Amino acid sequence: MTIRVAVLGAAGRMGSTTAQAVRDAEGLELVAEVDAGDDVAALAGRADVAVDFTLPDVTEANVHALLDAGIHAVVGTTGWDDDALGRVSDHVGRTAGLGVLVAPNFSLSAVLAMRFAAQAAPYFASAEVVELHHPRKVDAPSGTAVHTARGIADARGAAGSPPMPDATETALPGARGAVVDGVRVHALRLEGLVAHEEILLSNPGELMTIRTDTFDRASFMPGVLLAVREIADHPGLTVGLDAYLDL
């Protein structure tokens, strides 16, 4: 059965890459390319799944409109907070089996790096995350870095790990980065980059670094297409592509 796909934010870099990937994919049909000013509700009856690569200030409204239209939503736009996720979870729970996937990253290497970091975290005394992106990215830290930090914190909490050592008493504002559930996260914005992340885990006398580098947006497309094909089998709200993988 052919899956009918709409792309929201189709004029953007990720949106246009996604639209082309859908055109080229077997078993998928691109039925709409939606941009600012277009009516999302008009997709009702035309699309089975919509992929959202828009902006943080509109993506939640887009998801609610898609759910009202009976359309599964695959969301790659970052900037989501717990309140917004809670509202979407409540809404999708009132639908007849629709699914919403909010994925901080569709790169398979990034998804695996997040999983590896969570698995390793209980065995190390310290962990910090450094994310590096192009200077046009509008949110910091990245959704990937936040998701990574939360995974580390959850794993350490489940293992009963003690607080991470840090004797810093004075620092310039921001010098030690943001704190996500007790994990320090640092955001760099440099021209020439696309998307990169380093996860540093250490013990006395040793350091392990998990690094993932994205050089081209095409690297996200296998994950996006996987999500489009699998979302109907995952009703409700899912955060993170790893839930769709057999890990």
From Swiss-Prot:
Family assignment from sequence similarity: Belongs to the DapB family.
One Pfam family matching this protein: DapB_N
Protein name per the record: 4-hydroxy-tetrahydrodipicolinate reductase
CDD domains for this protein: DHDPR_N
Single GO biological process annotation from the record: diaminopimelate biosynthetic process
GO molecular function annotation: 4-hydroxy-tetrahydrodipicolinate reductase; NAD binding; NADP binding; oxidoreductase activity, acting on CH or CH2 groups, NAD or NADP as acceptor
PANTHER family reported for this sequence: 4-HYDROXY-TETRAHYDRODIPICOLINATE REDUCTASE 1, CHLOROPLASTIC-RELATED (PTHR20836:SF0), DIHYDRODIPICOLINATE REDUCTASE (PTHR20836)
Pathway note: Amino-acid biosynthesis; L-lysine biosynthesis via DAP pathway; (S)-tetrahydrodipicolinate from L-aspartate: step 4/4
Binding site for (S)-2,3,4,5-tetrahydrodipicolinate: H134, G143, T144
Enzyme Commission no: 1.17.1.8
Keyword presence, Cytoplasm: yes
UniProt cross-references to Gene3D superfamilies, sorted A to Z: Dihydrodipicolinate Reductase, domain 2 (3.30.360.10), NAD(P)-binding Rossmann-like Domain (3.40.50.720)
NCBIfam families on file: dapB
Residues that coordinate or bind NAD(+): G9, A10, A11, G12, R13, M14, G76, T77, T78, A103, P104, N105, F106
